[in-house]
């Protein structure tokens, strides 16, 4: 019988029969800026489908990731990864904090994608952390930071092209990475998910917001938006 190991705001991790494997289940829960948790019926099923599809695509271009296979509508089998305590945020268009903190016009397109690191902690409200702090805290080595940045940009470039092909702009995405050990050596591996929960997606022509950005102002449109993204990706 599988044992619950961890429950987050939108996913649950369970033990699997084999060592170093886990079962990741996608729930319908979503967290608002106020901290309130709401249910969007069917969201977990769509996120499982979308993330499975995108992780498979990334594997095809040589991006190591934790996804192994989809088990059922809500669950997937994943590789155990020692997850880094940081999130990697890649942005190519001014949104969110760039508008609030720097006064940049929303929608302004950057010359090159910008990478930010945040501490992976809801308790501390995901503060920005720089490379020198990451090194001094002992979270990653210099080589690991370099590898994470290179992989993050490659992933973002690939996903941007894929989404453009279905009429959607990838404005920003949040990625998580970790280590997988093979004897004394380790490799950097993409983990978590890639879905409308952690990607900022806009209609390419109208800049109409899709995915999680609708939670606060238009919650009744959230499922429809996730379904649209899933349907568009089926065309690829």
Curated annotation (Swiss-Prot):
Pathway: Purine metabolism; IMP biosynthesis via de novo pathway; 5-amino-1-(5-phospho-D-ribosyl)imidazole-4-carboxamide from 5-amino-1-(5-phospho-D-ribosyl)imidazole-4-carboxylate: step 1/2. Pfam families: SAICAR_synt (PF01259). InterPro entries: SAICAR_synt/ADE2_N (IPR028923), SAICAR_synt_PurC (IPR033934), SAICAR_synthetase (IPR050089). GO terms for biological process: 'de novo' IMP biosynthetic process; cobalamin biosynthetic process. Its EC number is 6.3.2.6. It comes from the Bacteria. It catalyses: 5-amino-1-(5-phospho-D-ribosyl)imidazole-4-carboxylate + L-aspartate + ATP = (2S)-2-[5-amino-1-(5-phospho-beta-D-ribosyl)imidazole-4-carboxamido]succinate + ADP + phosphate + 2 H(+). Keywords: ATP-binding, Ligase, Nucleotide-binding, Purine biosynthesis. GO terms for molecular function: ATP binding; phosphoribosylaminoimidazolesuccinocarboxamide synthase activity. One of its GO terms (cellular component) is cytosol. Belongs to the SAICAR synthetase family. This is Phosphoribosylaminoimidazole-succinocarboxamide synthase. It comes from Rickettsia rickettsii (strain Sheila Smith). The lineage of its organism: Bacteria, Pseudomonadati, Pseudomonadota, Alphaproteobacteria, Rickettsiales. The gene is purC.
């Amino acid at each position: 019988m599988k044992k619950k190991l961890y429950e987050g705001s939108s996913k649950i991790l369970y033990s699997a029969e084999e060592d170093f494997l886990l079962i990741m289940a996608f729930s319908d829960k979503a967290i608002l800026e106020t901290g309130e948790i709401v249910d969007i019926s069917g969201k977990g099923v769509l996120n499982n489908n979308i993330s499975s599809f995108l992780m498979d695509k990334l594997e095809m271009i040589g991006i190591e990731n934790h996804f192994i296979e989809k088990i059922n509508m809500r669950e997937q089998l994943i590789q155990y990864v020692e997850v880094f305590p940081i999130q990697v945020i890649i942005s190519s268009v001014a949104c969110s904090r760039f508008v609030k903190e720097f006064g940049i016009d929303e929608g302004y397109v950057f010359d090159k994608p910008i990478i930010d690191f945040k501490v992976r902690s809801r308790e501390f409200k995901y503060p920005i952390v720089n490379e020198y702090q990451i090194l001094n805290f002992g979270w990653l080595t210099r080589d690991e930071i370099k590898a994470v940045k290179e992989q993050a940009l490659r992933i973002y470039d690939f996903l941007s092209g894929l989404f453009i092909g279905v009429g959607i702009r990838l404005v920003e995405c949040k990625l998580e990475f970790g280590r997988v050990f093979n004897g004394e050596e380790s490799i950097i591996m993409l983990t978590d998910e890639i879905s409308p929960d952690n990607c900022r997606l806009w209609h390419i022509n109208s800049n109409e917001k899709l995915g999680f950005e609708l939670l606060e102002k238009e919650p009744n449109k959230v499922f429809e938006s996730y379904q649209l993204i899933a349907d568009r990706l089926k065309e690829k």
